[in-house]
Each structure stands twice: as C-alpha cells, then as structure tokens.
C-alpha cells in the first residue's frame, strides 16, 4: 500500500477543530428551567501557519498558530518560520490532520464555523498537576487497618516477588507524580457557540486549570 493511500485511509477520521483557553465553569438554564453546568472556553485568533501534504511531508495536515507572542519569547527557528510566511508571531503551534489540505492556505483564519451542526465534541488538555502522591490517592488503592497497632495505614504493600523475577515488573502502580498529563474527555455536549464573543460552552468539566489551552474537535466516534 502506498503512503498516499495509507494517509488517505487514516485521514477519513481526521477533522479540524479549534484551540481555546479555559475560562472557568458556570451554569446556564435551558427552556425547562433546568440548570446545566458548563465550561466556558475563549477562542483567540487562530491562523494557518503551514500546510503539509503527503508529497512534501509524508502526511496531510495543517499547522495553526494562536496566542500572540513577543519576539523575545520565541526561538530563531520559530521567528524564521513566521517571517518566511509573512505571519504574526504566535506562542502556540499545533497540527490538525486533515484529508483535504488543498482547501487551506497559509494565512487562513480558522473560524468557529467548523463547529456548526456539531452536537458532541472531544476536549483535550493538560490535567491539573497534583505533585508527588501515594498509591491511595494516585491509584485508589485500599488502605490498611487504621487501628493504633497498625503499621501500614496507607502503605502500598508488596511490589513484586522474590528471587524470581528479581525485579519490579514494568508498569507497576506505585507512588509518583500525579496529573499534569495529556487527557481527552470524549462526547461532551456542545451547548452553545457564541461566535460574536468567540466563546464556546461545553457541558461538564474539561481537563486543566483556568487559563490553560484546550483543543476542541467534533467527536469522531459513534455516540448515543
């Protein structure tokens, strides 16, 4: 199978989305007067900074930039990339895999219209960091006896066997850094798109703290 056919097959499920900044949570009311908890996401100007194709890059995608940046905060390579295409400087660059790169050109703006007629979305962001945590909080382990004589209130217990295999099995759930990792929440209801104010309202919570960037794309899987 050629690279082009492989990429076109993969590209069938690829879709364009938007990048926004998590503002916080609030609630709105529907026609029946029921309160709906929503997360408000603010979308800044998003511009196509590069178009990639199977012929030149091995896959089809568009690179977009958002959040204006000062020159002193960018590397020489990044500054050269923007200058080459006569673009403003952007702090955040991200790719979206698409199967129709010929429909885009450098400098195009990504509008909220990409979410028109969309009911469910997948939201990806970096979860809130919790620091170093033990197994009870990190992995929901059961605790030991809490009596006065107990010596293993919240200890993890055995982490392996003895002489055989003489090592700790890779992937063993142990204490360590919790959070601050890429998380995707799928099939969230898209409650409202306020194009006039560049706001998106999504039902429920999304990953990350207030002010952190998240990616919103139409749900690609079947949903009920």
What residue spans do the PLM features occupy?
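Extended basic (Lys/Arg/His-rich) segments that typically form rRNA-contacting surfaces
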Residues: 2-224
């Amino acid at each position: 199978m050629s690279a082009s056919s492989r990429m076109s097959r993969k590209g069938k499920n690829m879709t364009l989305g938007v990048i926004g900044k998590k503002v916080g949570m609030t609630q709105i009311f529907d026609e029946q007067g029921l309160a709906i908890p929503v997360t408000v996401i603010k979308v800044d100007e998003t511009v196509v900074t590069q178009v990639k194709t199977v012929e030149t890059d091995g896959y089809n995608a568009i690179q977009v930039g958002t959040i204006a940046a000062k020159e002193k905060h960018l590397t020489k390579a990044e500054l050269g990339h923007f200058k080459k295409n006569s673009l403003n400087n952007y702090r955040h660059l991200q790719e979206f895999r698409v199967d129709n790169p010929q429909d885009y050109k450098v400098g195009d703006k990504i509008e909220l219209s990409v979410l028109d007629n969309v009911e469910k979305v997948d939201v990806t962001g970096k979860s809130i960091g919790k620091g170093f945590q033990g197994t009870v909080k990190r992995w929901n382990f059961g605790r030991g006896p809490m009596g006065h004589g107990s010596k293993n209130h919240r200890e993890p217990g055995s982490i392996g066997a003895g002489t055989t295999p003489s090592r700790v099995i890779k992937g063993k759930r142990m204490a360590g850094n919790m959070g601050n990792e890429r998380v995707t929440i799928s099939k969230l209801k898209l409650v409202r798109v306020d194009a006039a104010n560049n706001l998106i309202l999504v039902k429920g919570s999304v990953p990350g703290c207030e002010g952190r960037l998240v990616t919103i794309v139409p749900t690609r899987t079947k949903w009920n």
